[in-house]
């Protein structure tokens, strides 16, 4: 009798739910084990590694040029920015400076990549929350940007355009004019997206005061990029530790006040506007001259040289098969990627292959704080929080 009464009075509310890895809002292969009390989250345990490919080890068995395409495939939404980080690391180890024109072109494409990333982030996030139109508009604009990729590299995504020593090839005829036209048109499209979302009552109810991160938490967890700036800390490597020609272009660093999902959305919208300013400056001040270093051992020979010189043909063959040797040493190069600080720690033993290449991906640090960000929120808020973290598992798992 006693046992029956005990069972009758006991009510079990807590249960465990698997979120992903096949969930459309998981942004890849994220598996979350959620401990729920009704619809309230008590704990979220992220399981990663489902996209692990051993990238860092693969790079150690390739020469410095052959390692470059692996960086396109880490965060496969922010391709050229990662090429940029790797190229800077190799150039610092080698002790070489690249021409001004190549630096301006690199910055131009870094900002094109930033817009590519943020359009996808906001579009997919809005789709997860329930707004469909921004995703369709965003993909329409991304097509135009991918066409710019295609015109300089032949590829829409994995470009391998920013290379150690400069860039692969010069801008084609009419390219500057087309980018200028895009900047003018895209400003209007940004206004339209903001008109749909920024003051939308449902959008704000889903984002405001959801997934709050304090400045102290952000620093303790190694946050960078939009998630760090949403807490009110104006840390941007383009301004804090300028590389290439970022100290010569005017732009502002948008920061948040609450550190919630809505702040992160607003910052991404403002960052796209600042990217347009930087792109306009690149078009205005783009100098003439060479797009590659003049160090013949570090860059391949030009096409016209190979048509006139057998030595150039031999050099071309050896360059792409054996690569170049980099002096022994170590360096760390970081760039402000759309998701945060993308860093490459490179150790050379004096051979033509990296002895060690450690990649610092911002998404890995952001994801480790997901349990704290989701605690005591509703299960529907998990989608909102993951969306504003802007996670891509190519860089998290590597």
From Swiss-Prot:
Claim: Secreted is one of the keywords in the record: no
GO MF term set: NAD binding; NADH dehydrogenase (ubiquinone) activity; quinone binding
InterPro entries on file: NADH_Q_OxRdtase_suD, NADH_UbQ_OxRdtase_49kDa_CS, NDH1_su_D/H, NiFe-Hase_large
E.C. code: 7.1.1.2
Record keywords, A-Z: Electron transport, Mitochondrion, NAD, Oxidoreductase, Respiratory chain, Translocase, Transport, Ubiquinone
Domain of life: Eukaryota
Coiled coil: none
Name the record gives this protein: NADH-ubiquinone oxidoreductase 49 kDa subunit
Gene this chain is encoded by: NAD7
């Amino acid at each position: 009798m006693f046992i029956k009464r005990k069972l009758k009075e006991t009510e079990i509310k807590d249960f465990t739910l698997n979120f992903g890895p096949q969930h459309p809002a998981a942004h890849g292969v994220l598996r979350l084990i959620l401990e729920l009390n009704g619809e309230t989250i008590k704990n979220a345990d992220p399981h990663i590694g489902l996209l692990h490919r051993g990238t860092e080890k693969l790079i150690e068995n390739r020469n410095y040029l052959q390692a470059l395409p692996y960086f396109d495939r880490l965060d496969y939404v922010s391709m050229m920015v990662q090429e940029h980080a790797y190229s800077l690391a190799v150039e610092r180890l080698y002790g070489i400076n690249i021409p001004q024109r190549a630096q301006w072109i690199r910055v131009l494409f870094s900002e094109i990549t930033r817009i590519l990333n943020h359009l996808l982030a906001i579009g997919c996030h809005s789709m997860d929350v329930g707004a469909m139109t921004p995703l369709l508009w965003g993909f329409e604009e991304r097509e135009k940007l991918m066409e710019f990729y295609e015109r300089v590299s032949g590829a829409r995504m994995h470009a391998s355009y920013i290379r150690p020593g400069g860039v692969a090839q010069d801008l084609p005829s009419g390219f500057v004019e087309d980018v200028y036209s895009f900047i003018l048109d895209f400003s209007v499209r940004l206004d339209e997206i903001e008109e749909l979302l920024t003051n939308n009552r449902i959008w704000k109810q889903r984002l405001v005061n959801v997934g709050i991160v304090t400045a102290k938490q952000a620093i303790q967890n190694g946050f960078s990029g939009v998630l760090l700036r949403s807490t009110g800390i104006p840390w941007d490597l383009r301004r804090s530790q300028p590389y290439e020609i970022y100290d010569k272009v005017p732009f502002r660093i948008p920061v948040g006040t609450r550190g919630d999902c809505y702040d992160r959305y607003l910052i991404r919208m403002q960052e796209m506007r600042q990217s347009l300013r930087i792109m306009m400056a690149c078009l205005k001040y783009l100098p003439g001259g060479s797009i590659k270093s003049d160090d013949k051992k570090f860059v391949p020979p030009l096409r016209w040289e190979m048509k006139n010189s057998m030595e150039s043909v031999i050099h071309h063959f050896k360059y792409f098969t054996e690569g170049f040797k980099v002096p022994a040493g170590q360096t760390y190069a970081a760039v402000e990627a759309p998701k945060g600080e993308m860093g490459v720690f490179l150790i050379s033993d004096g051979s033509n292959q990296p002895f060690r290449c450690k990649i610092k991906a911002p998404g890995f640090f952001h994801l480790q704080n997901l349990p704290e960000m989701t605690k005591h929120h509703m299960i529907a808020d998990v989608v909102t929080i993951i969306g504003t973290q802007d996670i891509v598992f190519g860089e998290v798992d590597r």
